[in-house]
Amino acid sequence: MLKAEGRTLIGGPVATSTPNGLAELIDDAQPFLRDHWRRRPVVLRSADLPTGSLTLDEADAALGTGALHSPYVEMVRTDRIIPREAYCTSRTVNRVDHPGYADAARIRALLHAGTTLVLRCVEQWHPGTAEFTRRLGRDLGRKVEAFFFVTPPGAQGLRLHRDDADVFVVQLNGSKQWYVHQGPDSPQWRPGPASDDEPPVVSPLLRTGEVLYIPRGFAHYATGDSGLSVHLSLTVRDIATADLQRAAQQLLFEAAPANRRPLDDDSMLADARALLEQLTSRLPALTPEQLLTAARAAQCAEALPQLSPGLTELAASLGAPPS
């Protein structure tokens, strides 16, 4: 369960106060958590955009340096695959050519031709976005990733598809027409392309400053409307059964001897007996809630720590050279 200021937020009674990261997306978290979280899509409005998240000016500057590299940079459209060579170039470092670096001129030309720009995993290379995703992740008890989409008017970057995540779409510029279809009807669903057998359940026109919430697995696609559409997709990852299996193995066998190589059958049988004894003693005490918490904690730990090499602190500690 998720706690905020000592109160259960998700998985129990609704909190009486809005948590930090979620407050930057939603004016009032209580109705959202009660009526929409993991249930159905909704358009939300917030007075402020996420603090410190990537802006269009910063994206322009990052692409202008040419330092961004594939796969952080991608161009997509529904009618054909855009090869990396169409929007990337080589950089020469120490007289060696290294391919795959963003080419600002090619990206601009493809945008004019109706192609969508995607900046992937922004939290891995933009400090402000990294800090916001950490705040939101703490509030929701999940791992959060960020993707930055730039779509020209009338263009569609991705086909109808399902994401293995809950998604908050934050419209930063222009507007975009969204079509959200129903979620999966069984736990055996797979992320990726989806069929449009049924009409969308909601089809909002998302404007600057609005936030669209799409529950995990709900199929969706979007087209650029007026102006240059820019949005930040905050993908809230959750675990699957395989994660529960790994967590169970870790909890049940965490104290078991590792890296042993018994040299005879008697020693091997003794180790097998010890493992079974540990399993039978630990299993009755393990609860489903503990297993779920451990699996989600392990997933959240996968997020990059965003550590700095501390060059400024190192310079200060060494002091200035004598004059």
Give residue spans per PLM region:
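Active-site region of the double-stranded beta-helix
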Residues: 2-35, 48-53, 57-210, 218-259
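Charged, amphipathic alpha-helical linkers/stalks
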Residues: 244-283
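Long, low-complexity C-terminal extensions of enzymes
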Residues: 270-323
